[in-house]
Curated annotation (Swiss-Prot):
PANTHER family reported in the protein's UniProt record: PEROXIDE STRESS RESISTANCE PROTEIN YAAA, PEROXIDE STRESS RESPONSE PROTEIN YAAA
Organism encoding this protein: Serratia proteamaculans (strain 568)
Protein family (similarity comment): Belongs to the UPF0246 family.
UniProt signal peptide: none
InterPro entries from the UniProt entry: YaaA (IPR005583)
The name this protein goes by in its record: UPF0246 protein Spro_0686
CC terms in the record's Gene Ontology section: cytosol
Gene Ontology BP annotations: response to hydroperoxide
Length: 257
């Protein structure tokens, strides 16, 4: 089973590390090409491109300038411990054992605008480069054209290494658009998380993001490898809704909190 999640805009390079082990990202040659393009952007251009404040644009211009492999624990941090958004709140990797990290390293992948695909223990320097932005490059007008089939190829390599053929898509639409589903060597499963509000069930962004992290945690902690095992997901009040699930879309509902 291969679990795919999105990165986060918020980063944490301060908290104590849950593990000292690390690996290097596998697509750094591609990342270098993007950094070269980004270094030519002024803070004003970065602000406009990313829709962020002048202060954040200045910070990210500095990050592009400081970026340099080879990464070390002194200048970088493991991806799973560096990202800090709602998904990662649900994942809560801070209490992972070394065995948990071993399983995650094999079965979890984070998509990234700059790094393409990250394994949990891959070191990364801080950055902001969302997959959906329009960044001119040699391959086209955006990062989807830049990455092409590279991301799908890496995901297939991971599937081949683990000998499984189940892919759990817990990434956002913006990020999963970088994957070519027809070329994935596995059955694609998409969990959907619905929360009750005023008597109606719907996707509530904050809760849905956290739930993606919770399901990732559930898979890692319980060493899941089969599609059927996902139906037992029950963290924080969610339960499988067979009646509303269709094909490879698995619906999980939670009553109003």
């Amino acid at each position: 089973m291969l679990v795919i999640i999105s990165p986060a805009k918020t980063l944490d390079y301060e908290s104590p590390l849950a593990t000292e082990r690390f690996t290097q990202p596998e697509l750094l040659d591609k990342s270098k090409q993007l950094i070269k393009i980004c270094r030519d952007l002024t803070p004003v251009q970065i602000s406009k491109l990313m829709g962020i404040s002048d202060k954040l644009a200045g910070l990210n211009a500095a990050r592009f300038g400081d970026w340099q492999p080879k990464f070390t624990p002194e200048n970088a941090r493991q991806a799973l411990l560096a990202f800090k958004g709602d998904v990662y709140t649900g994942l809560h990797a801070q209490d992972f054992s070394e065995d948990d990290f071993d399983f995650a390293q094999q079965h979890l992948r984070m998509l990234s605008g700059l790094y393409g695909v990250l394994r949990p223990l891959d070191l990364m320097m801080p950055y902001r480069l969302e997959m959906g932005i329009k960044l001119d490059n040699a391959k086209g007008k955006d990062l989807y054209s830049f990455w092409g089939e590279q991301i799908t190829k890496k995901l297939n390599e991971a599937l081949e290494q683990q000998g499984d053929d189940v892919v759990v898509n817990l990434a956002s639409d913006e990020y999963f658009k970088s994957v070519k589903p027809a070329k994935l060597h596995g059955e694609l499963i998409k969990p959907v998380f619905l929360d009750e509000k005023n008597g109606k069930y719907k996707v509530i962004s904050f809760y849905a993001k956290k739930a993606r992290g919770l399901m990732s945690r559930f898979i890692i902690k319980n060493r899941l490898t089969q599609r059927e095992q996902l139906l037992d997901f029950n963290l924080e009040g969610y339960a499988f809704d067979e009646a509303n699930s269709q094909g490879n879309e698995l619906v999980f509902k939670r009553p109003e909190q």
